[in-house]
């Protein structure tokens, strides 16, 4: 069960959705924000790009980096609740994890390694209800 007020960040390499759990006895997710590469500042590529990395892969790594920078800034300015769930595909999580600030890490109560950015709030709630 997720605590009321938990923020749920659902991401892939090209977009992210932020939900807040408004449920008390069951999970009820309300969409708070949609994030796209165009809605984030351009921080540039996520470190040195391997020669074999395609422009698409580089864009996905950059978006993941920008998303974590936004979440870190929210955590440091106390604009994140004490409980955050991250749902992202394994590749995006691989880009994101090393960039988590300690203040964001402290708030992350769960991670799901799934591609669910196009899933309904009901499907997300069902996935979060499983142990």
Positions of PLM-derived features:
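Terminal alpha-helical anchor/extension segments at protein ends
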Residues: 1-131
């Amino acid at each position: 069960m997720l605590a009321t007020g938990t923020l749920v960040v659902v991401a892939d390499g090209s977009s992210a959705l932020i939900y807040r759990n408004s449920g008390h006895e069951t999970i009820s997710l309300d969409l708070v924000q949609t994030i796209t590469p165009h809605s984030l500042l351009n921080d540039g590529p996520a470190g040195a790009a391997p020669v074999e990395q395609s422009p698409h892969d580089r864009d996905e790594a950059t978006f993941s980096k920008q998303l974590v920078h936004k979440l870190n800034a929210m955590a440091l300015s106390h604009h994140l609740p004490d409980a955050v769930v991250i749902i992202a595909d394994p590749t995006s999580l691989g880009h994101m994890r090393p960039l988590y600030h300690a203040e964001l890490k402290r708030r992350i109560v769960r991670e799901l390694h799934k591609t669910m950015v196009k899933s309904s709030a009901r499907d997300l709630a069902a996935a979060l209800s499983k142990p």
